[in-house]
Regions:
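Glycine-rich phosphate-binding loop of ATP-dependent small-molecule kinases
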Residues: 1-479
């Protein structure tokens, strides 16, 4: 591309292209654009983003800058980035985005920092692969600047009392070590380069060139997103492959008197565990899955009776809303991740993608097959933040499920619990069992185990869940 003399002639057409691509992206609403802007001090990050917003319709653009925030320390590392994702049809600009901590660590020569960068890089690569596969165009722009130009710009900014505030001690430190910083950043860019999210290196010395080139990058990514979104494959129900059947542990039945006594004892135990001072540094995430009428709601109520109402949230999960469908799949679950010292109880969960969406054909095969690894990474993020994860599959037999359906139909107070969707799912009982078997096999990890609970006897199942939950919390707090 020719340099400054062509700038004014290029801008009108580029602005038209950007606006047209943005309008088409918004109307189609099948993908979003997340633009990460990094760069050395005074390379023009702010000026470039401001110019791009000027060229676009700002009503459908958001800008985020992530700094240190006490609230963010209460949540897993990637929580704030997931919550800040743009909805399909929108564009978001991020100053440094999820690269801020990574590049900051890369500039530190200590052994601890080097170890930290390994996991940070892994997180970034997995996040970008996940987003790119699930409707987010990840655009990465790095603005570079030679040492002489940087030195002159810093000097000019510091000489004017109206702009002096823009130069931080970090800027000066990085400028003094320009060569080393540049090499470290180059290593970061190379390590985080991947097919789904490539880096665009733009020279920042020439303001006109920098802005036009950045605009072209954003335009081209939107056009590519529009082209690919038009080729969406038709979703069909998938045949469920044969896998090992679900484990069927045996739990003893109890009398009514035994149930009442044991329930009181276990609820007291749970109440004490979740009120311990140490628990404030942890947190708890519970996922309940199972066939319809398996007793998930009743089990959850026996848990919440032991908890402080200010401490927990029950999250009922049903078919995604229009808003939830306009984000990557896991976004809706990241929203409800609890802070330290709190509890989130999911009545159905992120496993819906490999259960109902798979069996009923609501998700494309490529999406649910990819979901196993994405779910394991999601749970790993929770565990690394000291959130204790417990997952329960309530296993009810076909005959017992039918008995409960009929019982509910005959009870006016319970009739609302059974709808046509439940009966439709019942005809696919065997397919759900096979899908659940593969789910347990592929997502059962050492720290986030599946607990398969025989649920034909509700009282025995509730006691078993409470007992298992208390043991899981005790293990988590002692780790």
């Amino acid at each position: 591309m020719k340099r400054p003399r062509d700038y004014r002639s290029l801008v009108p057409e580029l602005r038209d292209d950007l606006l047209a691509a943005q309008i088409d992206t918004r109307k189609l609403a099948k993908f979003s654009v997340a633009v990460i802007v990094t760069g050395v001090p005074t390379a023009g990050r702010t000026e470039t983003v401001n110019k791009l917003i000027e060229w676009l319709d700002p009503k459908y653009v958001t800008v985020r800058a992530f700094g240190e925030d006490d609230e963010d320390d209460e949540y897993p590392v990637m929580w704030r980035y997931w919550r800040a994702l743009p909805a399909f049809g929108r564009i978001a600009f991020y100053f440094w985005g999820w690269y801020g901590d990574y590049m900051h660590s890369a500039l530190d020569d200590s052994h601890q920092a080097k170890r930290r960068t390994v996991r940070q890089l892994e997180r970034i690569r997995r996040l970008e692969a996940m987003l790119s596969a699930d409707g987010v165009r990840v655009v990465k722009i790095h603005l570079d600047l030679d040492a002489d130009t940087q030195r002159k710009r810093l000097k000019k900014l510091r000489a004017d009392k109206l702009t002096r505030w823009r130069v931080t001690d970090d800027d000066l430190r990085l400028a003094r070590h320009h060569k080393a910083v540049r090499k470290a950043i180059e290593r970061c860019l190379a390590a985080s380069e991947q097919r789904a999210a490539r880096w665009n290196l733009i020279e920042g010395a020439d303001e006109d060139y920098r802005e036009v080139r950045a605009g072209e990058v954003v335009r081209d990514e939107m056009l590519l997103g529009l082209e690919r979104a038009q080729k969406t494959a038709q979703v069909r129900a998938s045949k469920v492959a044969k896998v090992a059947p679900l484990p069927r542990p045996r739990i003893p039945k109890v009398t009514d008197d035994e149930y009442d006594d044991e329930l009181e004892r276990l609820q007291a135990r749970l109440a004490l565990l979740t009120r311990r001072a140490k628990f404030r540094k942890y947190g708890l995430v519970l996922a309940f899955e199972g066939m319809d009428a398996a007793g998930k709601g009743g089990a959850i109520r026996r848990i919440t009776h032991a908890l402080d109402a200010r401490q927990y949230q029950v999250v009922p999960v049903s078919a995604p809303t229009a808003e939830e469908r306009s984000y990557p799949y896991l976004w809706r679950f990241w929203r409800d991740v609890p802070a330290r010292g709190h509890i989130a109880i999911f009545d159905r969960s992120w496993y819906g993608r490999v259960l109902v969406e798979r069996v009923r054909g609501f998700a494309a095969p490529a999406d649910w097959r990819r979901a196993y690894d994405e779910i394991c990474e999601f749970e790993r993020e929770l565990l690394e933040h000291d959130l204790i994860v417990a997952k329960f599959w309530l296993q009810v037999s076909k005959a017992e499920q039918l008995r409960r359906f009929k019982e509910r139909d005959e009870d006016k107070l319970k009739r609302f619990k059974v709808d046509p969707e439940d009966w439709a799912n019942r005809t696919l009982y065997d397919a759900y069992q096979a899908a659940a078997g593969e789910m347990v096999m592929r997502t059962n990890t050492r720290q986030a185990r599946w607990h398969v609970v025989p649920a034909d006897d509700k009282k025995s199942a509730r006691l078993h869940i409470l007992q298992t939950l208390c043991e899981t919390i005790e293990q988590g707090l002692s780790g």
